[in-house]
């Protein structure tokens, strides 16, 4: 399993909101964006493609995305258009995204360390693979 680098920018979602959530076979994609500042200027975007653990807390509801149970995907839709408050590493390679409401998404690495857990597609075109 790869780890986050020492110079990982935890402000990468500063000023962003969750614009879109996509579900695929064994994958959840979270697309974040900053509001467009001027016409004709492409907005800042960052995407997380999660293939391993994805947990969430919305109000008092705590859940985990289970690829075999599509009903575990529905609560994630409540995060749409929420502003990001912070991103922090709560355990090695485990990122917690906290929203302005206090609700959270936890992106976790693969327990076995044998597979890619998640990829972060940065606005610059760089990709971070964990």
Predicted features along the sequence, with ranges:
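Surface-exposed, interaction-prone regions used to assemble/regulate multi-protein complexes
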Residues: 1-130
